[in-house]
Regions:
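Terminal accessory/targeting
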Residues: 2-3, 21
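Phosphate-group recognition and catalysis centered on beta-loop-alpha active-site segments
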Residues: 18-220
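Hydrophobic alpha-helical segments, especially transmembrane helices
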Residues: 3-5, 30-31
Protein backbone atom coordinates (compact mmCIF):
# COMPACT_ATOMS: atom_id res chain seq x y z
CA UNK A 1 0.00 0.00 0.00
CA UNK A 2 1.41 3.41 -0.94
CA UNK A 3 2.13 5.89 1.81
CA UNK A 4 -0.14 8.46 0.14
CA UNK A 5 -3.13 6.15 0.48
CA UNK A 6 -2.86 5.71 4.22
CA UNK A 7 -1.52 8.99 5.55
CA UNK A 8 -5.05 10.28 6.10
CA UNK A 9 -5.63 7.39 8.50
CA UNK A 10 -2.61 8.43 10.51
CA UNK A 11 -3.39 12.13 10.54
CA UNK A 12 -3.69 13.11 14.18
CA UNK A 13 -2.00 16.47 14.45
CA UNK A 14 -1.17 19.35 12.16
CA UNK A 15 1.50 21.39 13.89
CA UNK A 16 1.55 25.04 12.86
CA UNK A 17 3.93 27.81 13.84
CA UNK A 18 4.35 31.54 13.41
CA UNK A 19 6.42 30.80 10.33
CA UNK A 20 4.18 29.95 7.39
CA UNK A 21 7.21 28.33 5.75
CA UNK A 22 7.12 25.47 8.23
CA UNK A 23 5.34 22.47 6.81
CA UNK A 24 2.62 20.68 8.79
CA UNK A 25 3.79 17.60 10.65
CA UNK A 26 1.94 14.29 10.82
CA UNK A 27 1.42 12.18 13.92
CA UNK A 28 0.45 8.52 13.76
CA UNK A 29 -2.62 8.14 15.98
CA UNK A 30 -2.03 5.06 18.15
CA UNK A 31 0.91 4.31 15.88
CA UNK A 32 0.76 3.05 12.30
CA UNK A 33 -1.70 0.23 12.77
CA UNK A 34 -3.79 0.12 9.57
CA UNK A 35 -1.64 -2.59 8.06
CA UNK A 36 -1.15 -6.36 8.43
CA UNK A 37 0.80 -7.47 11.53
CA UNK A 38 -0.02 -4.27 13.41
CA UNK A 39 -2.61 -3.16 15.97
CA UNK A 40 -3.52 0.05 17.75
CA UNK A 41 -1.08 1.01 20.51
CA UNK A 42 1.09 -2.02 19.82
CA UNK A 43 4.87 -2.15 19.77
CA UNK A 44 4.66 -2.99 16.08
CA UNK A 45 2.54 0.10 15.42
CA UNK A 46 5.22 2.22 17.11
CA UNK A 47 7.97 0.65 15.01
CA UNK A 48 6.04 1.13 11.79
CA UNK A 49 5.30 4.77 12.60
CA UNK A 50 9.02 5.28 13.03
CA UNK A 51 9.75 3.50 9.75
CA UNK A 52 7.60 5.81 7.60
CA UNK A 53 9.14 9.00 8.95
CA UNK A 54 6.18 10.69 10.63
CA UNK A 55 6.87 13.42 13.19
CA UNK A 56 5.46 11.48 16.10
CA UNK A 57 3.60 8.40 17.27
CA UNK A 58 0.72 8.90 19.71
CA UNK A 59 -0.18 6.40 22.43
CA UNK A 60 -2.53 6.28 25.42
CA UNK A 61 -1.57 5.57 29.03
CA UNK A 62 -3.57 4.30 32.01
CA UNK A 63 -2.66 3.45 35.61
CA UNK A 64 -3.98 0.10 36.88
CA UNK A 65 -5.36 -0.72 40.32
CA UNK A 66 -1.92 -1.96 41.39
CA UNK A 67 -0.14 1.11 39.99
CA UNK A 68 1.24 -0.32 36.75
CA UNK A 69 1.22 1.94 33.69
CA UNK A 70 -0.17 0.27 30.58
CA UNK A 71 -0.72 1.44 27.01
CA UNK A 72 -4.29 1.16 25.72
CA UNK A 73 -6.86 3.51 24.23
CA UNK A 74 -10.11 2.46 25.86
CA UNK A 75 -10.82 2.45 29.59
CA UNK A 76 -11.88 -1.18 29.33
CA UNK A 77 -10.04 -4.22 27.95
CA UNK A 78 -12.18 -7.26 27.19
CA UNK A 79 -14.72 -6.22 29.80
CA UNK A 80 -12.14 -5.33 32.46
CA UNK A 81 -11.98 -1.74 33.70
CA UNK A 82 -8.31 -0.79 33.68
CA UNK A 83 -8.38 1.50 36.72
CA UNK A 84 -10.04 -1.11 38.92
CA UNK A 85 -8.24 -4.20 37.59
CA UNK A 86 -4.86 -5.72 38.37
CA UNK A 87 -2.05 -5.64 35.87
CA UNK A 88 -1.66 -9.41 36.21
CA UNK A 89 -4.97 -9.95 34.45
CA UNK A 90 -4.77 -7.02 32.05
CA UNK A 91 -1.35 -7.92 30.70
CA UNK A 92 -2.61 -11.34 29.64
CA UNK A 93 -4.96 -9.72 27.13
CA UNK A 94 -4.10 -9.94 23.45
CA UNK A 95 -4.15 -7.23 20.80
CA UNK A 96 -5.44 -7.94 17.31
CA UNK A 97 -1.95 -8.69 16.02
CA UNK A 98 -1.25 -11.24 18.76
CA UNK A 99 0.87 -9.01 20.99
CA UNK A 100 -0.09 -8.69 24.63
CA UNK A 101 -1.20 -5.31 25.94
CA UNK A 102 2.10 -3.45 26.54
CA UNK A 103 3.24 -1.81 29.72
CA UNK A 104 4.55 1.73 29.38
CA UNK A 105 7.90 0.35 30.49
CA UNK A 106 8.04 -2.04 27.53
CA UNK A 107 6.73 0.64 25.17
CA UNK A 108 9.42 3.14 26.13
CA UNK A 109 12.14 0.50 25.98
CA UNK A 110 11.17 -0.14 22.37
CA UNK A 111 10.99 3.59 21.69
CA UNK A 112 14.59 4.03 22.86
CA UNK A 113 15.70 2.06 19.80
CA UNK A 114 13.77 4.38 17.46
CA UNK A 115 13.83 8.10 16.64
CA UNK A 116 10.15 9.06 16.26
CA UNK A 117 8.82 11.60 18.77
CA UNK A 118 6.52 10.19 21.43
CA UNK A 119 3.12 11.80 21.89
CA UNK A 120 1.85 10.51 25.23
CA UNK A 121 -1.86 10.90 25.92
CA UNK A 122 -2.66 10.87 29.61
CA UNK A 123 -6.12 9.36 29.92
CA UNK A 124 -8.63 10.91 32.34
CA UNK A 125 -8.52 8.92 35.59
CA UNK A 126 -11.35 8.85 38.12
CA UNK A 127 -9.23 8.93 41.28
CA UNK A 128 -5.51 8.67 40.58
CA UNK A 129 -4.80 11.41 38.05
CA UNK A 130 -1.95 13.01 39.98
CA UNK A 131 -0.37 9.63 40.74
CA UNK A 132 -0.62 8.62 37.08
CA UNK A 133 1.17 11.80 36.01
CA UNK A 134 3.86 11.34 38.65
CA UNK A 135 4.59 7.79 37.52
CA UNK A 136 4.55 8.62 33.80
CA UNK A 137 6.89 11.60 34.14
CA UNK A 138 9.26 9.63 36.37
CA UNK A 139 9.39 6.68 33.99
CA UNK A 140 10.07 8.93 31.00
CA UNK A 141 12.92 10.53 32.99
CA UNK A 142 14.42 7.18 33.95
CA UNK A 143 14.36 6.06 30.31
CA UNK A 144 16.18 9.21 29.21
CA UNK A 145 13.37 10.19 26.84
CA UNK A 146 12.35 13.57 28.26
CA UNK A 147 13.47 15.48 25.15
CA UNK A 148 11.46 13.23 22.83
CA UNK A 149 8.15 13.19 24.69
CA UNK A 150 5.19 15.55 24.32
CA UNK A 151 2.00 15.23 26.36
CA UNK A 152 -1.66 15.60 25.46
CA UNK A 153 -4.78 15.13 27.58
CA UNK A 154 -8.54 15.70 27.76
CA UNK A 155 -8.30 16.06 31.54
CA UNK A 156 -8.25 19.60 32.95
CA UNK A 157 -6.66 18.30 36.15
CA UNK A 158 -4.18 16.21 34.20
CA UNK A 159 -3.19 19.20 32.09
CA UNK A 160 -2.18 21.18 35.17
CA UNK A 161 -0.40 18.21 36.72
CA UNK A 162 1.62 17.55 33.56
CA UNK A 163 2.67 21.19 33.29
CA UNK A 164 3.68 21.15 36.97
CA UNK A 165 5.48 17.81 37.05
CA UNK A 166 7.13 17.52 33.63
CA UNK A 167 10.43 19.35 33.05
CA UNK A 168 9.97 23.04 32.24
CA UNK A 169 9.51 23.52 28.50
CA UNK A 170 8.01 20.09 27.87
CA UNK A 171 5.16 20.54 25.35
CA UNK A 172 1.78 19.86 26.99
CA UNK A 173 -1.39 20.28 24.89
CA UNK A 174 -5.07 20.34 25.81
CA UNK A 175 -7.47 18.17 23.79
CA UNK A 176 -10.87 19.07 25.18
CA UNK A 177 -11.64 21.98 22.85
CA UNK A 178 -12.90 24.32 25.55
CA UNK A 179 -10.05 26.57 26.66
CA UNK A 180 -9.17 29.87 25.05
CA UNK A 181 -5.66 30.53 23.73
CA UNK A 182 -5.01 33.17 26.40
CA UNK A 183 -6.06 30.74 29.13
CA UNK A 184 -3.63 28.08 27.91
CA UNK A 185 -0.87 30.67 27.62
CA UNK A 186 -1.45 31.74 31.22
CA UNK A 187 -0.79 28.22 32.54
CA UNK A 188 2.22 27.56 30.26
CA UNK A 189 0.50 25.00 28.04
CA UNK A 190 2.09 24.53 24.62
CA UNK A 191 -1.13 25.16 22.72
CA UNK A 192 -4.47 23.86 21.52
CA UNK A 193 -4.88 20.30 20.24
CA UNK A 194 -8.52 20.35 19.14
CA UNK A 195 -10.85 18.52 16.77
CA UNK A 196 -11.15 20.21 13.39
CA UNK A 197 -14.80 21.12 14.07
CA UNK A 198 -13.73 23.24 17.04
CA UNK A 199 -11.55 25.37 14.77
CA UNK A 200 -14.32 25.59 12.20
CA UNK A 201 -16.46 27.21 14.88
CA UNK A 202 -13.61 29.35 16.24
CA UNK A 203 -11.36 30.01 13.26
CA UNK A 204 -9.85 33.05 14.99
CA UNK A 205 -8.26 30.84 17.65
CA UNK A 206 -5.55 29.74 15.22
CA UNK A 207 -4.25 33.27 14.76
CA UNK A 208 -4.67 34.02 18.46
CA UNK A 209 -2.52 31.02 19.33
CA UNK A 210 0.18 32.01 16.87
CA UNK A 211 0.17 35.61 18.10
CA UNK A 212 0.71 34.29 21.63
CA UNK A 213 3.53 31.97 20.55
CA UNK A 214 1.41 28.84 20.99
CA UNK A 215 1.16 25.92 18.59
CA UNK A 216 -1.98 24.55 17.00
CA UNK A 217 -2.68 20.86 16.51
CA UNK A 218 -5.69 19.56 14.58
CA UNK A 219 -7.21 16.08 14.64
CA UNK A 220 -10.14 14.57 12.78
Amino acid sequence: MKIKSFLWILLFGVFCSNSMAELPKVIAHRGYWKTPSSAQNSLRALELADSIGVYGSEFDVWLTKDDVLIVNHDAVINGMDIESSSSKMLLKQKLKNGETVPTLDAFLNRAKKLSVRLICELKPHKDKQREAVKRIVEMVRKKGLEKRVEYITFSAEGLLELIEQAPKGTPVYYLNGSRLPKDLKSIDAAGQDYHINVFRRHIGWIKECHDLGLKVNVWT
